[in-house]
Amino acid sequence: MAKFANYLMLFLLVASLVMLEAQSSDTIKVPDLGKRLLMNRDPNGIPCAESCVWIPCTITALMGCSCKNNVCYNNEL
């Protein structure tokens, strides 16, 4: 029960900070952390969580991933 209360308080704190930020500006802006998470800094594409060192992309190939530099990447954004 204590963990739930801690998570609930953390959620309420974050929600209130987001609400204050949204009300303080006329337009809703994406925070810097959100911009960093949305930006793709890898020139190969988005990693598909599969390597292709010994065998080609098998499971993630169904999602459009291909092998580049021994890692499966998805280039469709």
From Swiss-Prot:
Tissue spec: Expressed in fruit, pedicel and stem but not in leaf and root (at protein level).
Signal peptide: 1-24
Biological processes annotated in GO: defense response; killing of cells of another organism
Organism lineage: Eukaryota, Viridiplantae, Streptophyta, Embryophyta, Tracheophyta
UniProt KW keywords: Cytolysis, Disulfide bond, Knottin, Oxidation, Plant defense, Signal
Positions where Methionine sulfoxide occurs in the chain: 63
InterPro entries assigned: Cyclotide, Cyclotide_bracelet_CS, Cyclotide_sf
Cysteines engaged in disulfide bonds, as pairs: 48-65, 52-67, 57-72
Post-translational modification, as annotated: This is a cyclic peptide.
Protein name, entry field: Chassatide C2
Pfam family, one: Cyclotide
Family named by the database record: Belongs to the cyclotide family. Bracelet subfamily.
